[in-house]
Design a protein with these regions (language model features):
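Short beta->alpha connector loops
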Residues: 99-102, 123-127
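Binuclear metal-dependent hydrolase catalytic cores
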Residues: 2-118, 206-243
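Short, solvent-exposed mixed-charge patches
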Residues: 246-247
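Cap/insert and terminal regions of metallo-dependent hydrolase folds
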Residues: 107-108, 114-119, 125-229
Length: 247
């Protein structure tokens, strides 16, 4: 979906790819309807930067022909559908609708490479469609928001007279999954492991992680990892091995 925290790095990704590689076309950006508008906006915002760099480094190093982003849009799938949105060799990516209302379109992705698979929830409340579309994945990457901690933040905002933060911390409760709901989804999907990402709120001290994870082990039989920046997940093809390494 197109919330700012999910797209704000696109410009830098495209620029680093362009200036640091040997490409003959812009970076193709796949997404639901609306992605062309996002791509156009980033290209407009970065156009002057491109001109500066090409003038400085030359056409061979920073050619305009490979600069920026291009869009490949697909329609929001109906529940029960998971169209292929990217395919290359043994790699196949399908998209499915999730529940992040009032934000629409919002999708998750299932990524299959040979005999291994992962699914990425995107932002969503607990979703029956997600569970259906992710059956049997090796690893489910699922967002989670601790409603216990966010409600405490909401109470603190009210006490401090911060009406804006009080409103926001109330509004966000109903369009994200709780940690236990993420674990339930992994269990119902038959996933082998659950990696929780998009962790809300951040967990800067270890006692908060205990509060965040409360009840998850009762809801899911497999391995649970609360991810941090730098968490690395590897699934060797031709095996059932799942290697998860966090800093």
């Amino acid at each position: 979906h197109f919330h700012s925290d999910h797209i704000d790095g696109l410009g830098e990704v495209a620029t680093l790819r362009w200036a640091g590689g040997d490409w003959d076309s812009p970076l193709m950006t796949h997404g639901p309807d609306g992605v062309a508008e996002i791509v156009s906006g980033f290209n407009l915002a970065y156009h002057r930067d491109q001109a500066y760099r090409t003038e400085h480094h030359g056409l061979e190093v920073t050619p305009p022909t490979s600069w920026g982003l291009a869009a490949s849009a697909f329609a929001l799938p109906e529940d029960g559908e998971a169209p292929v949105v990217f395919e290359s060799g043994d790699l196949r990516v399908t998209a499915f609708a999730v529940d992040h209302e009032p934000v629409s379109p919002a999708v998750g992705y299932r990524i299959q490479y040979k005999d291994r698979s992962i699914a990425i929830s995107g932002d969503t409340a607990k979703s029956a469609n997600l569970i259906e579309m992710t059956q049997g994945v090796d690893v489910l990457f699922h967002e989670a928001l601790s409603k216990v901690i966010v409600r405490r933040m909401n109470a603190a905002a009210k006490t401090a007279g911060n009406s804006g933060m009080a409103q926001i911390t109330m509004d966000i409760l109903d369009y994200h999954a709780s940690p236990v709901e993420a674990a339930e989804s992994a269990q119902e999907a038959g996933a082998s492991a659950l990696v929780v990402y998009h962790v809300v709120p951040p967990l800067p001290i270890s006692p908060l992680e205990g509060i965040f994870k409360e009840g998850m082990d009762d809801a899911f039989d497999g391995e649970i990892e609360i991810s941090v920046d730098g968490t690395f997940v590897s699934l060797p093809a031709g095996s059932n091995e799942i290697d998860i390494d966090s800093p």
